[in-house]
């Protein structure tokens, strides 16, 4: 009993000492040139997970810190990064930041999975900042990427907008939100632009770090979790064709606990390019109500809770809901299309010491696509007023990652990932199909010399259907003075989706049946790039040349036509997904940015692509 009482007393004493040892740091950040407050500056404590952002008066406060010296690292897109050392719980700090006329101090994480200033990353990463988004007055992520990055292009049809990156469709690159992969359809439509802090864009294969599908590039959306006590914002935009966007954000932070809530409403009217279309039988023009861009309404709700147990251990839980329903003209269509997504996840991060930390994340994404009939439809046997679920997908992801600084020359990233994909489809007669993927990855960032660094990584993948595969990547960076020279190679890997393996599809405009193929093989690629960059305080210019060779591309192979197709399949044309193509994409990206003075910036970019697409064998028809 005495021993128990003694242990209890010691424990309570330690807790009391720990409470008494907690200190706070507060102050104000201003411009060194104008003494005006700097709003939205990010302050992070070195060797800690604690941090905050400045309010509209440039003020900040960070509490629950252990007593002793602390290094504050301050960053802002318009200012040069700065670090200062404080002693204990200092109050009323006045920190002055120097103006930065270009984004040379921007911190990025996508290229290597670890934090680097953009000019110090061995893998080239381009950045779109919140300031860029505001200046461009964009309301959606796809609009932002098209306006602000020449590597992106889009195609709009009656079903919506699809993006391409360096000539490759969105099946070949992935979207991340704060480093967490987004699954399912409508990935970029779910992002609330009002919450974006920056967008990091990695061109080229990165399967070693980010897994399957990342053979064309990675887009990482970093959102802004404000650390002020209370932050409420609202943004309303209206444009032609009834395009309306309303965003509301409510953030509450009490020190250890944080709540971040966002809601966005989008809607638009449909529009036509031509009120006439050609009759497929008579080849004569006739009036049509079909649209080039479909009207829609969409709602996005996201909620995130955080808990900072200590300055080295933090937890989060998050969830979200998204829906998008078309508004198609009654005279031209039989049904609307409804997409719904809900997702949830939990995670934790523990900082062992400076440069060493472990993260664990568990995430799930549920997506469904449905036909909402307002007329009877023979193709899908739909009745007016009915709703028919076309497809349901579920993605479950569990990942653990550790980053360890080994001496002064090595930074090692290791981790594992387990993914389960599930597909159900009423219209495709798929009761349930699923597959799992297990991955192990390792990457080492090596400082060879003062101005020379290398990166070597590999991912091992075991897929339930496609077994073993490995994807390596290598990068080298030489940095003499204000110049940066980079060279890289990466192998990519894309497994066929469950829809490509199992799903069937009936075309809406002609009598054509598309069927799955259980004999599909993974698509593979080799990506090479060379880049040169010059960075000055007032201007920067970069040139990047690349070559991407994709093998075993999945395309459509016509297997039956005419009477034989009708006899065997009941349709005039039948095609099957198959590995029948090879694509070679090579090109050059040029970008430049200059500060002209008096608050004026001039920036521009140019992308030149050459794409060759070869069918490996002729169509086989019955």
In which residue ranges do the predicted regions lie?
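Periplasmic-side early beta-strands and strand-to-turn transitions of outer-membrane beta-barrels
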Residues: 227-229, 237, 252-337
């Amino acid at each position: 009993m005495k021993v128990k009482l003694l242990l209890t007393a010691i424990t309570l004493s330690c807790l009391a000492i720990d409470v008494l040892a907690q200190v706070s740091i507060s102050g104000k950040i201003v411009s060194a040139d104008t003494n005006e407050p700097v709003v939205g500056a990010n302050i992070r404590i070195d060797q800690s997970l604690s941090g905050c952002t400045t309010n509209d008066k440039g003020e900040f406060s960070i509490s629950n810190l252990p007593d002793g010296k602390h290094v504050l690292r301050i960053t802002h897109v318009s200012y040069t990064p700065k670090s200062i050392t404080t002693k204990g719980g200092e109050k009323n700090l006045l920190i002055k930041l120097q103006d930065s006329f270009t984004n040379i101090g921007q911190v990025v994480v996508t290229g290597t999975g670890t934090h680097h200033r953009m000019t110090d990353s061995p893998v080239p990463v381009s950045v779109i900042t919140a300031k860029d988004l505001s200046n461009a007055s964009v309301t959606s992520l796809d609009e932002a990427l098209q306006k602000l990055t020449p590597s992106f292009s889009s195609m709009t049809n009656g079903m919506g907008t699809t993006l391409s990156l360096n000539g490759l469709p969105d099946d070949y690159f992935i979207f991340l939100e704060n480093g967490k992969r987004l699954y399912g359809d409508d990935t970029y439509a779910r992002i609330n632009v009002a919450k974006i802090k920056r967008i990091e864009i990695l061109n080229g294969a990165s399967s070693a770090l980010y897994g399957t599908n990342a053979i064309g590039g990675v887009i990482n959306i970093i959102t802004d979790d404000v650390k002020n006590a209370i932050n409420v914002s609202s943004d309303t935009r209206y444009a032609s064709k009834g395009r309306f966007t309303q965003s509301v954000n409510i953030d509450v932070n009490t020190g250890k606990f944080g709540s971040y809530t966002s809601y966005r409403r989008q809607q638009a009217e449909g529009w036509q390019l031509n009120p006439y279309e050609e009759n497929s039988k008579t080849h004569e023009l006739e009036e049509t109500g079909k649209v080039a861009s479909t009207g829609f309404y969409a709602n996005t709700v996201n909620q995130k809770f955080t808990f900072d147990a200590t300055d080295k251990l933090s937890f989060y839980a998050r969830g979200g809901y998204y829906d998008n329903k078309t508004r198609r003209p009654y005279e031209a269509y039989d049904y609307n299309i409804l997409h719904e997504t809900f997702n949830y996840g939990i995670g934790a991060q523990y900082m062992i010491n400076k440069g060493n930390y472990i993260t664990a994340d568990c995430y799930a994404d549920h997506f469904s696509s449905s036909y909402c009939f307002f007329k009877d439809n023979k193709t899908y046997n739909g009745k007016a007023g009915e709703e028919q679920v076309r497809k349901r997908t579920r993605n479950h992801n569990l990942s653990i990652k550790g980053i360890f600084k080994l001496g002064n020359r090595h930074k090692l990233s290791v981790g594992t990932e387990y993914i389960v994909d599930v597909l159900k489809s009423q219209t495709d007669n798929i009761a349930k199909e699923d597959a799992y993927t297990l991955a192990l990855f390792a990457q080492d960032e090596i400082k060879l010399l003062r101005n020379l660094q290398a990166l070597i990584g590999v991912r091992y993948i075991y897929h339930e259907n496609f077994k073993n595969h490995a994807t390596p990547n290598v990068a080298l960076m030489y940095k003499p003075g204000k110049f940066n020279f980079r060279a890289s190679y990466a192998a990519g890997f894309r497994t066929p989706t469950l829809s490509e393996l199992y799903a069937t599809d009936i075309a809406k405009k002609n009598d054509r049946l598309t069927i799955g193929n259980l004999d599909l093989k993974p698509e593979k690629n080799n990506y090479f790039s060379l880049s040169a960059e010059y960075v000055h305080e007032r201007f920067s210019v970069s040139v990047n040349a690349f070559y991407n060779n994709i093998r075993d591309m999945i395309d459509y192979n016509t297997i039956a036509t005419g009477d034989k197709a009708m006899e065997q399949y009941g349709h005039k044309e039948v095609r099957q997904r198959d590995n029948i193509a090879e694509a070679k994409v090579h090109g050059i990206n040029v970008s430049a940015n200059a500060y002209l003075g008096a608050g004026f910036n001039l920036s521009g970019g140019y992308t030149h692509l050459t794409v060759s697409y070869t069918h490996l064998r002729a169509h086989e028809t019955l």
